[in-house]
């Protein structure tokens, strides 16, 4: 599965080579995807190369070859200037603006239960794009939420198992952009990928810490990470 940014870059390179026969420059790619620096382009190209979508040709400047396109090739994913992805975004279709989670809706006369929208999936592992589904709500105890706006995400991965969060669980998130050290947060990395991790500070940098010794703590500059909310509850279904 490619992230939206990876798909946008792949299609931009593909279309440019169809038009001119020459791959775009790193500056052109950076501008087309509205990234702040070329380092983000280097990371995207490396990811595409590792997944077998492109190949770098040796001993030639700006030499890239598109080997294949995604099975669900969608020209609408060509990058548009000014596109700003959110932590919740569509998978392969045209991106849709995502409204802030609506105020919780009581679902019982006694007010003991609240309906919360399930907004998609979140990685507890290597970051992936969260995928907006928003096809259903879940009902949670009102005392789980407290004040503020909330949404739910389905967990994919095992990097938070020592915190009691398992693959397939549903986490309840209080919407917000700040966190304290030790909070488990939804973190958006490089405006592209979302992950569920414990928030730490390492000097001026931000550390996203797993709760599984098989995963390394990842360190980022403060401008590369945006907090999208904090964990306040968890729901597990037993089948």
Swiss-Prot record:
EC number(s) on file: 3.4.21.88
Site (Cleavage): 124-125
Active site residues according to the UniProt entry: 159 (for autocatalytic cleavage activity), 197 (for autocatalytic cleavage activity)
Keywords, comma-separated and alphabetical: Autocatalytic cleavage, DNA damage, DNA repair, DNA replication, DNA-binding, Hydrolase, Repressor, SOS response, Transcription, Transcription regulation
A Pfam family the protein falls into: LexA_DNA_bind
Any one of the GO BP annotations: SOS response
Family membership: Belongs to the peptidase S24 family.
Assembly information from the UniProt record: Homodimer.
Protein name, per record: LexA repressor
The organism of origin for this protein: Rhizobium etli (strain ATCC 51251 / DSM 11541 / JCM 21823 / NBRC 15573 / CFN 42)
Gene: lexA
